[in-house]
A protein has these predicted regions:
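Catalytic domains of carbohydrate-active enzymes, especially glycoside hydrolases
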Residues: 239-261, 358-360
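Short Pro-Gly-centered flexible turn/kink motifs
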Residues: 172-192, 624-632
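Glycine-rich, aromatic-flanked loop segments that form ligand/cofactor-binding clefts
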Residues: 193-212, 227, 254-256, 277-330, ...
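The substrate-binding groove and active-site-proximal loops of carbohydrate-active enzymes
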Residues: 222-238, 264-278, 330-349, 381-395
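Active-site-proximal substrate-binding groove within the catalytic cores of carbohydrate-active enzymes
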Residues: 179, 183, 398-607, 618, ...
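C-terminal beta-strand-rich structural cap/linker in extracellular carbohydrate-active enzymes
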Residues: 610-634
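Polysaccharide-binding surfaces and accessory modules of carbohydrate-active proteins
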Residues: 16-156, 597-604, 617
Length: 634
């Protein structure tokens, strides 16, 4: 442990900065123009975690008053050894960007963890840079998500990539003589490999120190999912009921009733498409249960349409911004409800009783990018000590949902889908099923899976609808990474009143589902242990390994390249994208050099077996899109 007041000779190594109204202080003690601000810092190596340091910083004003507007922690520069440095930048915007990004010359990204667009905010308070020989991560060890930025930049004509933890104070803070400014608790971690190691170490520290408690998933959370979303919002009850036998026949266990049953966001009773009201919803769950299926209900809490009965009768539930306006949710054309508000809590409890008891659903599919974060809440009815308690404590709202739902149904599966967002880390501890959350590509399914496996190894991860993967059929991405499989096929026809699709279960799609369902159930990789044996960005092809049933399951992937100007391969005509392929050598890491193994191409239509020597674990391959391999001791 080291406690010191930094002197002038340390200025070149300075990693903190104070942005003040009077000066930009970048070396300490700062003694210019009559100021005297001293930095004190404790740097504590964490026992038994090589490379991890906990950093606690505070500033003492020993001179004339100074007004602090912002501060930086852990400012770090990495010398680029190649033309690209890979990074974890888990912040959220409406661009729905990859969490993992290549950083090249000219790159700059702010990574603010508060609200960046009307619906988008939140993330993970960790930023990581790595190269072939290892990486360095910085972040916060705080009890809630602080609204910091994590800027990453590679300035043109240089060879340094910088990152920092930047905090803009909500209001300028005047430090009088003798006052102290205590900063957020930060960390720095040097590591081998990629972002998996950074997130695993961060999350393990958070759990070991009682800051968060991750919830292990029960067997039900790993069962395959069919979602009625393929029928769209104007779906009818008979469409769902008419599909159940086929759902059962194909091996799915969960039936997710999607958006469209409700009067409006906020008024969650059934609309005119369900004239029987509560009886119709109960009939759906009864028909599911009769077939041995489970039913999960889609729900977008904390959203209320302006013309709803809820808004008219309970304005005290609405979040108010610093301008005393309602916070708007663009996607739903709704307003935010206050997440930390006693009236909202009571309203939510009543809804849970309707969903899980009266309607008898077995779980919840909680959905919407707005669930990841919100603006500060100035609603006096919320009773907050600070308006910033709303975004910081927002995940606790979902913790209450989880606890109440599990009290009503002890094996309820609670999924939160922050669509397109980098998940709010503090949400992860309030659920028992994570989700790929509207992935833009197969690659996003895989990179998110790796992140969740690092943060919460026992948490089920649903790979979302297969229709959202490249080509709409990439079961290899879901199964090879240990994800729960799912689909939103329609049967026997699409909904003529819904323009999206087609999602119709064709003979070809049915054959594909039957093949991969058998593989999914026989190997049970979703319940296996994810091993971090390959480095994202530097090992090619992209590789993942799952340990399950005394076997190692390898999965290798090459991604399509979209035509110039296309947003993403998953959202262009497959005919215009060349099928990606790889021909060359693969190294099977993690094998014992003293043993001989049998390798099985377990997803091939005609599985091939061959021998692998652990002392020389390389094989020659030639494949398109993916190559999945099961390796067992001989």
């Amino acid at each position: 442990m080291c406690l010191n007041a930094c002197s002038k000779k340390d200025a070149k190594q300075e990693t903190e900065r104070l942005v003040c109204a009077e000066a930009d202080m970048q070396s300490f003690p700062y003694t210019e123009d009559g100021f005297n601000v001293v930095k004190h810092q404790t740097i504590t190596p964490v026992e038994n975690v090589p490379g991890l340091e906990v950093i606690e910083t505070y500033f003492v004003n020993e001179g004339k008053p100074v007004t602090v507007k912002a501060y930086d922690l852990c400012r770090t520069e990495v010398e680029a050894k190649d033309t690209v440095v890979w990074s974890l930048q888990p912040s959220s915007t409406n661009a729905r960007m990859d969490w993992v990004l290549p950083v090249t010359e000219g790159f700059a990204k702010e990574n603010y963890l508060g609200m960046n667009n009307s619906d988008y905010g939140g993330g993970i308070p960790v930023v990581d840079l790595w190269q072939r020989d290892g990486g360095i991560a910085i972040g916060l060890f705080e009890p809630v998500l602080r609204m910091i930025s994590m800027p990453v930049e590679w300035k043109r004509y240089g060879n340094k990539v910088s990152m920092a933890l930047h905090y803009d104070l909500p209001e300028p803070l005047e430090l009088a003589t003798g006052d102290t400014l205590k900063c957020f608790k930060a960390f720095r971690y040097t590591h081998e490999g990629d972002y998996f190691n950074a997130l695993r170490t961060f999350s393990k520290y958070m759990q070991d120190n009682g800051i968060v408690t991750m919830k292990p998933s029960e067997p039900e959370a790993f069962e395959p999912v069919w979602c009625a979303g393929g029928y769209g919002r104007p779906f009818k009850m008979n469409m769902v009921l008419g599909t159940l036998d086929k759902v059962k026949e194909l091996g799915f266990t969960w039936v997710d009733i999607d958006d469209g049953y409700q009067i409006a966001e906020g008024d969650w009773n059934t609309n005119k498409l369900f004239p029987g009201g509560d009886k119709d919803m109960r009939h759906i769950t009864d028909e599911c249960h009769k077939r041995g299926l489970k039913a999960k209900l889609w729900w977008a809490p904390l959203a209320a349409d302006p013309d709803t009965k809820l808004v008219k009768e309970h304005p005290e539930m609405l979040l108010k911004t610093d301008e005393w306006a309602h916070e708007y949710i663009t996607w739903w054309d709704s307003w935010y409800l206050s997440p930390i508000n006693p009236a909202v809590d009571a309203y939510t409890t009543d809804l849970l009783k309707m969903f899980l008891q009266k309607w008898n659903f077995d779980g919840l599919k909680i959905d919407g990018q707005h669930l990841n974060c919100c603006l500060p809440d100035y609603n006096e009815a919320s009773g907050l000590e600070s308006p910033w308690d709303a975004p910081e404590q927002m995940p606790s709202y979902f913790g209450k949902i989880y606890d109440q739902a599990r009290a009503m149904k002890s094996d309820a599966v609670i999924q939160v889908c922050p669509c397109g967002c980098a998940v709010n880390y503090f949400l992860v501890s309030q659920i028992n099923q994570a989700v790929a959350s509207d992935p833009m590509s197969s690659k996003q399914v895989r990179m998110k899976r790796k992140a969740y496996a690092a943060m919460a190894p026992e948490l089920a991860y649903y790979g979302d609808h297969i229709e959202l993967t490249d080509g709409g059929n990439d079961f290899a991405t879901q199964i090879g990474t240990g994800s729960v499989i799912g689909t939103k096929f329609t049967y026997p026809e699409d909904n003529p009143d819904w323009m999206e699709g087609p999602f119709k279960l064709t003979p070809e799609k049915e054959a594909l589902i039957r093949k991969w369902m058998k593989i999914y159930k026989e190997n049970n990789l979703a319940r296996g242990e994810y091993l971090n044996l390959y480095t994202w960005g530097f090992d090619y092809p992209e590789a993942h390994v799952i340990r399950q049933n005394n076997a190692l399951y390898y999965a290798f992937y090459v991604d399509p390249v979209a035509p110039e100007g296309a947003m993403d391969p998953a959202h262009v005509d497959a005919a215009t994208v060349p099928v990606p392929s790889y021909k060359g050598t693969l190294e099977l890491r993690g094998l014992d050099p003293a043993k001989i193994y049998t390798a099985i191409e377990y997803t091939a239509d005609e599985p091939r077996e061959f021998e692998v020597n652990g002392a020389n674990p390389t094989i020659e391959v030639n494949f398109e899109r993916n190559y999945l391999l099961k390796v067992i001791e001989k």
